[in-house]
Amino acid sequence: MESIVQAKRVLEIFKEMSQIPRESGNEKGISDYIVNFAKNLGLEVHQDDQFNVVIKKPASPGYENRPSIILQGHIDMVCVRDHDSNHDFSKDPIANIIEGEWMHADHTTLGADNGMGGAMMLAILEDDSQQHGPMQLLFTTNEETGMDGAFAIKEGQVSGDYLLNLDTEVEHDFTVSCAGGCHVHVNIPLLRENNQPGYDAGLSFTVTGLKGGHSGIEINEQRANANQVLTRVLYDIQQQYPVCLASFEGGVKHNAIPSKAVAVLSVRAEDVAAIKTLIAYQEKQYLHEYGIQDPGLTFVVEDVATPDVVYADDTTEALITYIYLAQDGVHSVSKSIPNLVETSDNIAIVRENEHTIEILISIRSSNSNSLEFLAKKMILLAKTLGVSAERTGGYPAWEYDKGSKLEEQAISLHNEMFDTPANVNAIHAGLECGLLKGVLPNTQMISFGPTIVSPHTPMERVHLPSVENVYVYLKALLAKLQ
C-alpha cells in the first residue's frame, strides 16, 4: 500500500514469520529461523535452552562510543480461531490479508502481537545503512503464557545502556513502568464432619453476573470480587441463623477478578424462607454498592439435597474470617503517574484440595516496598488465624525512572517527528521489562509499538500506517540516542 515505504521489508519479514508455527510453547521453529537469519548476516548469535535468541551487531562506524542498545520483543503468539475455522496452528501458515490501512488474518489471530515488533528488529538488523551504537537483539519466548523466556534470562546473557521494547500496542504510546507481583497461597485445613441433627435442608447460593476482568488492567474500576461478596453475605447469614457450610468455590485464574462464586449450605428447613428473603435483601444492597461498575450482579439461591457432610466449625470460621478481613482491590495509587494503580491485590481463587481449602491471592505493585508490605500483611493475617500461608511466583516491578535520559530523548524525538504528542503511561500488569530489569538493573527502558486492535482474538488487526511510522521513528531514534 502507498503508506508503506520504508517498512516494506518489515512486512516481507513478517510474512516469512507467518509461515512458521509459533504458538506459545512451540517456538523452536521461529527461534531457529531467527538464528539462521543472523548467521546469514555473519553476526554473533546465541540460542538458549528456552529458545531465547540474542544477536550482537557492532556499532556503525563513528558510533562506537554511543550508548549500547538492546532491541527486545517476544516471538510467540496467542493462537485463537473462529469456531467455524479449521486452521491448524501447529502447521498452517497465518494469512496476511490487507484491507485498506489494516492487515488481518483469515478468521484467526494474526500474531502482530508481537511478530510485527520482531519483524522490525530483523529489518533493522540486516540494514547496514542504519546508524546505531553497539546493538543487541533479544527475542524471548513464551511471553503470552507465563513470560518463561524472560524469566530464564540470566545476568550477563544480554547487556546494554538502553532497552527498547517493541510490544506496546498503541502508536504514540510509550510505556515506562509496570507492576511486579507475587502470589500468596493460604491453606486452611479441610476438616469435615457429619451434618448435624436438625439441619434438614440444603441451599446452593451463587454470586454471579459480575464483569470480572484482568486483575492487572480492570482492577482500577473497583469491580466486585465474587469471592468476597459471597463471604460477606455468608457472614451476615451466620449472624442470624444456624448454618453449616458444605462447600465454597470461586474464581478460575490467578489474574482474573472472580466473576462467580458458589457455596452450598446446610440449614434448618424452618429457616429456608427467611434466609432466601435475607439474600434477596442483600442483593439489593450490593447492587446499590456495586451497581455502577457491576450492574449484572445477581444472587441465585436454589434448593438442593441436604448435605451429608459439612465443614467443621474451625474450617468454616477460618475461611470466612480470612476472606472477610483480607482487603481486596486497590490499595494505593501512584504519586508519580496520574491515575495509575500502584498496589493492589485480588482474592483470585478459592478451591478445595484434598486436605485443604486454598485461597490464592494475586498481589501487584509498581513499588517493591509496597509489594513486600502487602504480601507480609496477607501472610500475617493467616498466621493470626492459625493457618498456613506461603508466598510464591514473584516477579520484579519495572519502577518508573522519572527523568531518565532515554525517556527524555525518546519523547523529544517523537514530538519533533509527529503532530500527535507522545502519551507516556504505565500499566499495572506485569511485562517482560519488569523481569529483564531484574537482570539489567542499570539499563534504562522504554516500550512502544504500532497500533494493534483486538489482540488475542480472531479479530486481531494491525494498522499499517502506524507500522510505517513506528519503524521510521525507530530508525531515527537508533541514530540519535546519546
Predicted regions and their residues:
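Acidic/His- and Gly-rich active-site-bordering loop/insert found
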Residues: 2-101
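Zn-dependent metallopeptidase/amidohydrolase metal-coordination segment
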Residues: 10, 335-338, 342-358, 362, ...
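Active-site metal-coordination/substrate-binding segment of hydrolases
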Residues: 63-139, 143-145, 150-161, 324-328, ...
